[in-house]
Amino acid sequence: MKKKLTAADMHDPQVIAETPWFSMRKVGIDVAPGERRDFYAIHYPRPAVGIVAIQDEKVLLIRHYRYLIDKVVWAIPSGGVDEEEDPAVAALRELREETGWQAQRVEEIIRFNPSYGSSDQLFITWLATDLRWVGMDAD
């Protein structure tokens, strides 16, 4: 039977790389008696947000190139939460920056960890309704 891992099985955490947005950590994990393996994970100090914007029964998506996967994808507006920023405010900011639309109403849908096998990033998804066009910023 496979051993159920707990926090007590984790030892010697180390930050091995750091950026302004995340850090990479290494931790020793006791996977069996006398057997310790190194595990690597990405730590995000702040959550990311996404916003599902609905107007006239249609979902607003953005289309953009993602260099990490070398593909053009359809996605909901999303991005990181700035330091000291409220996640709802961040979601509304991302909606405006990426689409030119502003929402009059926003409510949290779900919080989840999309890559829990390799990172601790928290992703908070919001529902935006009562949209109005305010235009894209010049930059």
Feature-to-residue mapping (PLM):
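Recognition helices and adjacent regulatory flanks at domain boundaries
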Residues: 65, 94-97, 101, 124
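Conserved Nudix-box catalytic region and its N-terminal flanking loop in Nudix hydrolases
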Residues: 2-5, 42-93, 110, 134-135
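A short coil-to-beta-strand element that immediately follows conserved catalytic motifs
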Residues: 9-10, 102-109
